[in-house]
Regions:
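Solvent-exposed, amphipathic alpha-helical segments
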Residues: 3-10, 57, 61, 92, ...
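Helix-turn-helix
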Residues: 3-41, 45
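Short coil/turn segments at alpha/beta junctions that flank glycine-rich nucleotide-binding fingerprints
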Residues: 10-14, 65, 86, 131
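Hydrophobic alpha-helical connector segments
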Residues: 45, 56-89, 136, 140-147
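Short, basic, alpha-helical segments at the C-terminal edge of helix-turn-helix-like DNA-binding modules
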Residues: 48-54
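Amphipathic alpha-helical packing segments from all-alpha helical-bundle domains
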Residues: 55, 85-91, 104-131, 141-142
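Amphipathic C-terminal alpha-helical segment
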Residues: 82-85, 95, 99-102, 123, ...
Length: 157
């Protein structure tokens, strides 16, 4: 999976091939084909696994915190932990957001990293308003999009 994640990140979905992934994984192309009937199936599995490793783990960690700043910080910390063990994870997530614009059929709603992170940030902002951290006249859509842009911008970095 790591080899596939790296190849998809470096080459993009269209240019990635089972052969390139097999070479990176030190396997044969038929070995990969045995487990994944198509590039789309492999890509979706990589998306699902990477989202669970980075986004879902970050959200779970952030839900333990009690303030907006601590929740966003916990999310970043969890993502950085995932990145420190597998440098391809964050790069792939950023690439997957771009690929979803080119190929909407590749991403299921359940495993859409951008949507999941946006929902998390909206929840965290709503909670911050309820707790009085942010004023009730806060422009929720604007602050959510700004925070999501910062999160994903850090992913590009």
């Amino acid at each position: 999976m790591r080899a596939a994640r790296e190849v998809f990140s470096e080459l993009g979905y269209d240019a990635a091939t089972f052969q390139a992934i097999a070479i990176r994984a030190d396997l044969t192309r038929p070995a990969i084909n045995h487990y994944f009937s198509s590039k789309r199936v492999l890509y979706r599995d990589v998306v699902e696994q990477t989202n669970a490793k980075v986004i879902a783990a970050g959200i779970a960690k952030a839900r333990e915190a009690t303030t907006l700043l601590n929740r966003i910080s916990a999310f970043f910390a969890a993502a950085m932990d995932a990145e420190s063990t597998d440098r391809s994870a964050a790069a792939f997530l950023v690439t997957s957001v771009l690929e979803a614009q080119r190929h909407p059929e590749l991403i299921s709603e359940e495993h859409d990293a951008l949507r999941s992170s946006r929902e998390f940030v909206k929840w965290a902002v709503d909670e911050a308003i309820q707790r009085g951290e942010l004023s009730t006249d806060t422009d929720i859509p604007a602050i959510v999009e700004m925070l999501v842009a910062v999160m994903w911008g850090m992913g590009f970095y």
